[in-house]
Amino acid sequence: MRKSYRIKKESEFQRVFETHNSVANHKFVVYQMEKPGQKHFRVGISVGKKIGNAVHRNWVKRRIRQTLLEVKPQLRSDVDFLVIARSAADGLSMAETKKNLVHVLNRAHLLDEKSED
């Protein structure tokens, strides 16, 4: 995913957190903030230290990014959102990661059309 699709600055993360607009399931939490007029969505990914070591956390982040790339055409363009992996997301297969992440994105109304891959 290109850099223009990422939220990297702490201040931008905090702005999205402060909206208190979140949806969660057992594996992931998604915070979102409406940004009317934005060309494309932006996403921040956070995996806490409760999940393994740095190598393992990066592995989880790669799976989240891959899932987002696969559903990218369906994602709304007028939002910034954060995906936070809970400790239950540790050890998920790629298929399980996609299923759980798509579920929480649907609950947050971030996907334009219902997807149950």
From Swiss-Prot:
- Broad class of enzyme this protein falls into: hydrolase
Which Enzyme Commission number(s) are on file for it?
A: 3.1.26.5
Gene Ontology biological process terms from the UniProt entry: tRNA 5'-leader removal
Pfam families in alphabetical order: Ribonuclease_P (PF00825)
GO CC entries: ribonuclease P complex
Record's catalysed reaction(s): Endonucleolytic cleavage of RNA, removing 5'-extranucleotides from tRNA precursor
Functional note: RNaseP catalyzes the removal of the 5'-leader sequence from pre-tRNA to produce the mature 5'-terminus. It can also cleave other RNA substrates such as 4.5S RNA. The protein component plays an auxiliary but essential role in vivo by binding to the 5'-leader sequence and broadening the substrate specificity of the ribozyme.
Protein name, as recorded: Ribonuclease P protein component
Species annotation: Limosilactobacillus reuteri (strain DSM 20016) (Lactobacillus reuteri)
